[in-house]
From Swiss-Prot:
UniProt entry tagged with the keyword DNA damage: no
Annotated family: Belongs to the polyribonucleotide nucleotidyltransferase family.
PANTHER family the UniProt entry points to: POLYRIBONUCLEOTIDE NUCLEOTIDYLTRANSFERASE, POLYRIBONUCLEOTIDE NUCLEOTIDYLTRANSFERASE 1, MITOCHONDRIAL
Protein's name according to its UniProt entry: Polyribonucleotide nucleotidyltransferase
Binding site for Mg(2+): 486, 492
BP-aspect Gene Ontology terms: mRNA catabolic process; RNA processing
Superkingdom as given in the UniProt entry: Bacteria
């Protein structure tokens, strides 16, 4: 295939897609450029399904190469290692809008690899990677109902901005990524500064309208390349088997889905399918395959649950479509942590813990754009016991990283600036029970644990997950969805925010045909649920605690002369090391002279502060100091008046009478009162005990005398 190149103006940038030159052995490969950001995206599919495969094995790997930004990795091996959080989140961002567009029953393995080859610090590579994935899949001929477009939307001065730069995003009230086909929105991921539902919906529709030119460009590219589609057809369904399975299971499944408790419902459904498998002799030469029966079973379960809701009956757990499950809240549940909260909503429960730290505890991130640190962290963990299962426990999976990032987005808008609250903060959400919307429970629990720790949040933040059931023109929006409703429904729509507006929104749609009106209904219904949860949270913990935990570090901040920093550090760090060890504190000094002391004991903190102030203080001529004799000389003594500030006390300045032997009047380690008589250009001090004694007498005789 000869090289083909297409370009358009996309926002302020030039977007270019090229194919036919690089990675020609991949089934589909494109180079996507947005100004100086360049991404290679490839798509490869296995033309045969593995025996017994009963799910769609799609893998998306997004990789950021350090050479793309002219950098060498900072690790010991000097090469890229395991995926960073940014790479994991972008891989999920690419995966979510394309996964629903592969046909049902397509179980062939597909792998998408997106490699960042050149990185412009002003243009994130995620949008080019999403566009490139769509183009590579279309060119590959793999069964795929695309193409998909993608856009980033900002909101500055009440105007939407298409594909804002990194600099623009710093002043934007919105950072929203939307992806969709020509007719439908499929995915939204955003964080916002308490924006209204109308502004958020407007951003989604604006982004969808703007991406149409990208979809047209991909179609033109595919037409010119002459794509050959795979010869793939879904397996024909055995209608007689469908009828048998329906007869054996439908009535019992309807009864099982009326059980409100998840564990009882799951057990009943498992028993039904075990009986059906036995009666149909699944897995034997006489019976059907397990995969065929499971596919029919999933469709049957979906039909039962969906029709029940659309027909106006109650949901699985007996609620109406707008009802939030019962909520209970406890805070301060753990005695030694800095802040904690237990948030329970129905059968979903999150134990959130907040830990306060110093600037030294901030997360250091080695990114393409350069090193930076984050003072607010949120980590989400969901062990297998949360769903009554066994499984691997250890490093977080992609899902856990994604859920943690969503909860973090929701809370970022209310975190106080460092000038108001100098601590770094880490929230960990331990999901101890899960039956739908554990990420939104993490938002609520995380907010409450921060307030329990004494973090002065701007407002309470609550999150809620919405669902959708749609058949033809009939649809129902569900508030606070269960796990089964998420699994069997058409949309997972998570909204978090304050009483004033939305701070985070995530939408994943499994079908095409979700209209603007449906999204509007979902947003307004989500607001109703969010305000209900916020009211309960406020009743439990109206404001943040006025004081932090006794187990949290105290922070003391002040400034010193930047030229004196080296005096505090000392040779080889000896002075500051001794300070931290002797006072039990942690001390950080910035280049501008800002000093931060973290301590558990306030006495230790004040002691460290005084010693630093003494080290950095300038000796004043004419002032009297309490000094320490460091060394005796034949002609006097060396006396320290401040840390690192020593002077000569001449023998003639020790006493009013003549002194023959210095040792008769002084000894090393003795504390003496001395007055600074002179400081020369090199900082050498001349001291006097006689003058100090005279000044003291004058002050005693005349209290109005203010001599130093």
């Amino acid at each position: 295939m000869k090289p083909i190149k297409k370009s358009i103006t996309y926002g302020r940038h030039t977007l270019t897609i090229e194919t036919g030159e690089i990675a020609k052995q991949a089934h589909g490969a494109v180079i996507v450029s947005m100004d100086d950001t360049v991404v290679l995206v490839t798509a490869v599919g296995d033309k045969k399904t593995k025996p017994g495969q009963d799910f769609f094995p799609l893998t998306v790997d997004y990789q950021e190469k350090f050479y793309s930004a002219g950098r060498i990795p900072g690790s010991f091996f000097k090469r890229e290692g395991r995926p960073s959080e940014k790479e994991t989140l972008t891989s999920r961002l690419i995966d979510r809008p394309i996964r629903p567009l592969f046909p049902d029953g397509f179980y062939n393995e597909v792998q998408v690899v997106a490699m960042v080859l050149s990185s412009d610090t002003e243009i994130d590579a995620d949008i080019p990677a999403m566009i490139g994935t769509s183009a590579a899949l279309i060119l590959s001929g793999i069964p795929f109902d695309g193409p998909v477009g993608a856009a980033r939307v900002g909101y500055i001065n009440n105007e939407y901005i298409l594909n804002p730069t990194t600099t623009q995003l710093k002043e934007s009230q919105l950072n929203l990524v939307v992806a969709g086909t020509q007719k439908a929105v499929l995915m939204v991921e955003s964080e916002a500064d308490e924006l209204s539902e109308d502004v958020m919906l407007g951003a989604v529709t604006y982004g969808h309208d703007q991406m149409q030119q990208v979809i047209d460009m991909i179609n033109e590219l595919a037409d010119e390349a002459g794509v050959t589609a795979w010869d793939w057809q879904p397996a024909e369904q055995d209608l007689s088997l469908v009828e048998k399975v329906t007869q054996l299971a439908e009535a019992d499944l309807r009864n099982a889905f009326r059980l409100k408790q998840k564990s009882a419902r799951v057990e009943a459904i498992n028993e039904i399918w075990q009986r059906v498998f036995t009666e149909l002799k699944v897995g034997t030469e006489e019976g059907p395959s397990e995969q065929a029966v499971r596919e029919i079973g999933f469709a049957l379960e979906a039909r039962i649950v969906r029709n029940s809701i659309l027909d106006g009956e109650s949901r699985i757990d007996g609620r109406g479509t707008r009802t939030v499950r019962p909520i209970t809240i406890r805070h301060g549940v753990l005695p030694r942590t800095h802040g904690s909260a237990l948030f329970t909503r129905g059968e979903t429960q999150a134990l959130a813990i907040t830990t306060l730290g110093t600037a030294r505890d901030e997360q250091k991130i080695d990114a393409l754009q350069g090193d930076y640190s984050e003072r607010f962290m949120l980590h989400y963990n969901m062990p297998p016991f949360a769903t009554g299962e066994t499984g691997r426990v250890g490093t977080p999976k992609r899902r856990e990283i994604g859920h943690g990032r969503l909860a973090k987005r929701a809370l970022l808008a209310v975190i106080p600036p460092v000038e108001e609250f100098g601590y770094s903060m880490r929230v960990v959400s331990e999901v101890t029970e899960s039956n739908g919307s554990s990420s939104m429970a993490s938002v609520c629990g995380g907010c409450l644990s921060l307030m329990d720790a004494g973090v002065p949040l701007k407002a309470h933040v609550a999150g809620i997950a919405m669902g959708l059931i749609k058949e033809g023109n009939r649809f129902a929006v569900l508030t606070d969805i269960l796990g089964d409703e998420d699994h069997l429904g058409d949309m997972d729509f998570k909204v978090a925010g304050t009483e004033h507006g939305i701070t985070a929104l995530q939408m994943d749609i499994k079908i095409q045909g979700i209209t603007k009106e449906i999204m509007q209904v979902a947003l307004l219904q989500a607001k109703e649920g969010r305000l209900h949860i916020l009211e309960i949270m406020k009743q439990s913990l109206p404001i943040a605690r006025e004081s932090i935990s006794v187990h949290a570090p105290r922070i003391i901040k002040f400034k010193i002369n930047p030229e004196k920093i080296r005096d505090v550090i000392g040779k080889g760090g000896a002075v500051i090391r001794a300070l931290t060890e002797e006072t039990g504190t942690t001390i950080d000094i910035s280049d501008d002279g800002s000093v931060t002391i973290a301590c558990v004991s306030s006495e230790g903190g004040e002691q460290a502060r005084k010693r630093i102030e003494d080290i950095t203080a300038d000796v004043e001529v004419g002032r009297i100091y309490e000094g320490t004799v460091l060394k005796l000389l034949d002609f006097g003594a060396i006396v320290s008046v401040l840390p690192g500030k020593d002077g000569l006390l001449h023998i003639s300045q020790i006493a009013n009478e003549r002194v023959e032997n210095v040792a008769d009047h002084l000894k090393e380690g003795q504390t003496v009162r001395v007055k600074v008589l002179e400081a020369d250009e090199k900082g050498r001090l001349r001291l006097s005990m006689k003058a100090a004694s005279i000044s003291t007498e004058i002050t005693a005789d005349n209290p109005d005398n203010t001599e130093k």
